[in-house]
Each structure stands twice: as structure tokens, then as C-alpha cells.
Design a protein with these regions (language model features):
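Serine residues within intrinsically disordered or low-complexity segments
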Residues: 7, 29, 37-39
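Absolute N-terminal positional cue centered near the fourth residue
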Residues: 4-7, 48
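Active-site-adjacent structural elements in enzyme catalytic cores
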Residues: 33-34, 38-384
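Intrinsic-disorder-associated, low-complexity terminal segments enriched in Asp/Asn/His/Tyr and depleted
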Residues: 2, 26, 35-38
Length: 384
């Protein structure tokens, strides 16, 4: 059964630095500054937790960014692992903390569209039209980078992905830091993306300097990525903004092959989520597509002993005694987007040998949900 996990309980603390005591926010009562030796590449650090978006907390979080630290940031899509996008050393720490391949580019986050000209060359009118309609929101635009944006941030590309997140805490931190924040999803590379602070604690506690709890993510899947450097524009990753909404502004949009399959070895990804296996729980996943009734019956008939199920609400009763995670009603793709990563991640805490998942059709937000499930499965898909 799907359950929304609450944020960890928080208690006020004082943080000691350079012999001084100063209030920085809140810290989970059960996670008080654990020192964890994570790896030889990334030394253990004390993680400070912020909860209330006070002026003091925003400034303290911004200082972490300015000083080259790593900060978990809330957005409407998923939680991000943020650093100063212009600081190559800080950006390198993102890759090390996540275990992320360095040819996998990062998205930079800005507080509004006026920042586009700071970091992008030859910004086309279409970019401003999209920003006017969809920013702040779950849309990333690929544009030519200015030299101020390091190649380390862009994965070696001459383009950069830019978005304005629809979360007041993160926009306030960006504005206070006065630098763009490079932020991939805050999970360990390859795992399901974090949609609440508990997920961030699970993956990054003791690896990064700060985490800002902004509550559960309203959208639940990453941003849609559109490449505006080609004609027609190209969808590189489906996400929280449906393809149909983009085409209402831009006209026809091509869909990159990476949306429906993995890139081959040697092919360079132009955006996050294109090349590598992503979003995967520990147990192998099989995705079953087709009519919801037919796919549910197929899983019921073929489900191995010890396997778990991700299914639509209407079909939970077909799997008594099984480990089940409810993806939401078959017709409610927005709810499926909010639940998909939680369902995948929760199976890591259960004794399942493999996972069978129902999958929505690709209309609207269904394209993003389908993409995340299929990537979690390494595109191991059964059509019924």
C-alpha cells in the first residue's frame, strides 16, 4: 500500500564554527550530525538540516553554496543535490557524492528568466516564450553556454540546461547566493530519485554540508528537457511538463530516441537521464505495458514467487499476500508521477526477488512515468 512518508522530526540546534555558536535552523532528532566515512573519494562531513525558510536559514544555506559546499535543495519535481554551478571543484564534488559519470551533464537552476543572458549565448525568442508560460516550473531548456559556465558542469558540452524551479525556498537560496545552482537529482547515481527529505537523508547524510527540507515534492518526476539548439526543437527527457504543452507553444517537437531506449556506448548524452540506467531499485524490474486490465491479468498469471508488484489502484486485489505498491488510479497520471519513485525506492526495504510493474500509456504525464519505469527496468518491457 502506498504511504506518504513524513519528514523526519526536527529540533532546533546551534552549530559551532570557528569557535562561535550561531543558529542555522533545524536538525532531525534521530539524525544529529552523524559523521559517516563514505568513501576515500569523499570525506565525511557534518550535515546540517534546515527546515523553516527564515532569512537566517536561507542565508546560511546560501553560504554553503558560496563556500563551495553541497546542499540538498527542494524543488517541485524531485530533491536536488546542489552546488555553485560556476565552481568546478564544487561541481566535481556532486559527481563524487553521487557516483555519477562525469559525461552526464548537470542542469543549472536560476531564479528567473532574466538570468538566461548571464549564462547562455544567443537566447532565442522561443526560450523566452517558454519561460513566460512555464517558469517557474518543471521545464529545462538546452541552450548554447557562455564561457563562464564550466565544461565540467555541462559534461564537456557547448550547451547547458537551464531551469527555474517552482519552489520558493530554492529560488530564495539561489538569489541569496547570487550564483546559479547546478543540481542533479539528489540520489546515489542509478537509484530512484528522492521526493522527500527522508530519501535525501538515506542517500546523502554525512556526504554533504546541508539539507533544506521543503516538504514532499508536488510533481514527483524530474523536469522535461527540451533542446532549443536544433530545428525542430527536440524532447530529450519527458518530465513534469507534458510534450503536448510544449507543442502548443513551439509547434512540432521531435522526440529523441533516448526517450524510448538507452544510448549506445560512445554516444554522448546531451542531457541528464539519456545514457545510463537510472531510477533503479536493487531488485530487477519488468515493465508490462498495454490495456490496464490485460497487463494486470498478465502479471497475476506470470508473477514469480517472491516478486513484488507496482500496480494501479484498481488491481491491488489481484495480488493478495504479495508486496504491493499502489501507483495510483489508472487514469490519474499526475498521481502516478508523484508515486512512482516512492514505489521503486520502497522495494529496497522489502525482501523481493524482482518487481513487476504496470505502466501507463504515453499521453500527457504518462510519457514521463512510462520513461522512468522503463529506465528502471533497463527497458526490459513486455507488451500485452
Amino acid at each position: 500500500m502506498h504511504q506518504t512518508r513524513p519528514s523526519a522530526p526536527f529540533l532546533p540546534i546551534l552549530f559551532r564554527q570557528d569557535g562561535k555558536e550561531w543558529a542555522v535552523g533545524d536538525i532531525p532528532s534521530l539524525q544529529i550530525c552523524k559523521n559517516i566515512s563514505n568513501s576515500k573519494k569523499e570525506p565525511h562531513v557534518k550535515t546540517v538540516y534546515f527546515r523553516d525558510p527564515t532569512k537566517e536559514n536561507i542565508e546560511a544555506a546560501a553560504k554553503i553554496i558560496r563556500d563551495g559546499g553541497l546542499l540538498a535543495i527542494p524543488t517541485e519535481t524531485v530533491y536536488g543535490l546542489g552546488a555553485d554551478a560556476l565552481n568546478e571543484d564544487a561541481v566535481l564534488r556532486i559527481f563524487l557524492a553521487k557516483g555519477r559519470p562525469q559525461d552526464n551533464p548537470l542542469i543549472i537552476h536560476v531564479p528567473d528568466s532574466s538570468w538566461l543572458v548571464r549564462y547562455c549565448e544567443n537566447v532565442p525568442p522561443e526560450a523566452y516564450a517558454l519561460a513566460e508560460k512555464f517558469w517557474p516550473g518543471p521545464l529545462t531548456m538546452i541552450l548554447p553556454r557562455k564561457p563562464i559556465v564550466p565544461l565540467r558542469t555541462t559534461g564537456g558540452l557547448e550547451t547547458v540546461g537551464v531551469r527555474c524551479p517552482n519552489h520558493p525556498i530554492t529560488r530564495a537560496v539561489i538569489a541569496a547566493a547570487d550564483v546559479p545552482i547546478a543540481a542533479p537529482s539528489g540520489n546515489t547515481s542509478g537509484r530512484p530519485s528522492p521526493t522527500c527529505i527522508a530519501d535525501m537523508i538515506e542517500d546523502m547524510d554525512g556526504k554533504i554540508e546541508g539539507m533544506f527540507d521543503g516538504g514532499p515534492c508536488a510533481v514527483g518526476v524530474e523536469s522535461t528537457i527540451i533542446d532549443l539548439t536544433c530545428t525542430p526543437p527536440r524532447l530529450l527527457r519527458p518530465g513534469g511538463l507534458p510534450l503536448e504543452a510544449l507543442e502548443a507553444v513551439l509547434g512540432h517537437v521531435d522526440v529523441d530516441k533516448a526517450v524510448v531506449s538507452l544510448l549506445k556506448d560512445g554516444e554522448r548524452p546531451k542531457a541528464p537521464g539519456m545514457k545510463y540506467r537510472h531510477y533503479a531499485p536493487k531488485a530487477p524490474v519488468t515493465v508490462v505495458t498495454g490495456d490496464p486490465e490485460a497487463s494486470a491479468r498478465y502479471i497475476q498469471t506470470h508473477l514469480p514467487e517472491g516478486a513484488g508488484v507496482i500496480c494501479f489502484t484498481e488491481y491491488k486485489d489481484l495480488f493478495p499476500g504479495r508486496s504491493i505498491h499502489d501507483l495510483g488510479p489508472a487514469a490519474d497520471k499526475a498521481e502516478q508521477a508523484r508515486r512512482v519513485f516512492d514505489a521503486l525506492r520502497e522495494f529496497d526495504h522489502e525482501a523481493v526477488t524482482e518487481i513487476y510493474a504496470q505502466c501507463p500509456d504515453t499521453a500527457g504525464l504518462g510519457l514521463a512515468v512510462s520513461n522512468r519505469l522503463k529506465k528502471a527496468a533497463g527497458f526490459h518491457v513486455i507488451e500485452v
